[in-house]
A protein has these predicted regions:
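Active-site-adjacent structural elements that line small-molecule/cofactor binding pockets in enzymes
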Residues: 1-332
Length: 332
């Protein structure tokens, strides 16, 4: 049976509130947490952006069984890959068997805060690939150096605090090239909700890459992040989407937009019809169950759900009681 996880939107809630929500989620049948790594919220209305690595340490210490990781960290701009490796190894040492490392190529909203030129997508992918190579070297526990890199330098060094086994590395992508590389070189894939046809294609590319590397893709985690809006009425659910998560209705890539204020200006153009086929908005819990079930049937091992409204306690209890128990194991 797929893990149903709670997507912790650190760009939307105070970190202490999110800890309480995750503890509540653990008591109501959620099995994992995917934590957003943001420097800024998407739009000012969301109101927060706590440091995910501090927060995950608290999450690990105040929950018992939840698996968790950042969804996702970019190891290329705000962080040097060696620092990401150290942070991940420390977290995995403190919560062995529970932590995974989610990595991606970054968004200007969060990474441009350190200045510099914002590269084209193919350059960001190359940077991610080089960064992953450094992280994997350090996870071995051996002395490593990286003095011939195109984008990064690292002196002769090793990690001194290591977990019993290295945390698995999952790569976030919505494109086929990165999906295939993730299958070859990493341990799992993370992707946002999309059409079944697109997701089927991405999983196929991921599996193709895994087979090229002699790995069994059936044993490699496939994670989905799913935004939705549930409330007691359709009108309330729609208003939550428009107010709290208008970025979910923007029909274009968002990696190059640089500030919450820029997003807010674009959000003024978002209308209810823009959410169609992008995010389920419904008061019907069985409709949400059926929506999640189709992704379980497609082959995802973990589905991390984010209800975009402020009604988090009601959402967690309702889904824990009436949605999660009624999901079936994959029929594929």
């Amino acid at each position: 049976m797929a893990i149903i996880g709670y997507a912790a939107a650190l760009e939307q809630f105070h970190p202490n509130d999110l800890l309480a929500y995750c503890q509540l989620a653990e008591r109501h049948g959620f099995k994992g947490v995917m934590a957003a790594d943001h420097f800024q919220p998407w739009v000012p209305q969301q109101g927060h952006s706590a440091f995910v690595w501090s927060w995950m340490a608290a999450l690990g210490a105040t929950t018992c069984t939840l698996t968790f990781g950042p969804g996702v960290t970019c190891p290329s701009f705000r962080y040097h890959p060696a620092i990401v490796a150290q942070a991940a190894a420390t977290q995995a040492a403190m919560t062995p068997g529970r932590f995974w490392l989610g990595l991606g190529s970054g968004e200007a909203l969060n990474e441009r805060v350190v200045g510099g030129v914002w590269p084209e997508p193919h350059i960001r992918l190359q940077m991610l690939q080089e960064a992953v190579g450094i992280i994997k070297k350090l996870f071995t526990g051996k002395v490593a150096r990286h003095d011939d890199g195109r984008y990064f330098k690292m002196e002769r060094v090793r990690l001194w605090t290591l977990p019993p086994t290295p945390p698995p590395i999952y790569i976030a992508t919505a494109g086929p090239v990165t999906a295939e590389w993730a299958g070859r070189e990493c341990d799992g894939i993370i992707t946002p909700g999309a059409s079944l046809d697109k997701l089927r294609m991405l999983l196929g590319k991921f599996e193709e890459g895994a087979r090229k590397a002699g790995k069994d893709p059936a044993r490699m985690p496939k994670l989905l992040q799913l935004h939705m809006s549930w409330a007691e009425t359709y009108e309330e659910a729609m208003q939550n989407a428009l107010t709290e998560w208008p970025n979910g209705g923007m029909p274009f890539p968002k990696q190059d937009i640089r500030s919450p204020e820029d997003f807010a200006e674009i959000a003024r153009l978002v209308r209810p019809e823009n959410f169609k086929n992008r995010m389920l908005i419904s008061p019907d819990l069985d409709e949400h169950r059926a929506y999640i079930q189709q992704f379980v049937d497609l082959g995802f091992d973990e589905i991390h759900v984010h209800n975009v409204g402020r009604n988090q306690e009601q959402f967690i209890k309702a889904f824990g009681e009436q949605v999660i128990p009624r999901l079936n194991a994959s029929s594929t």
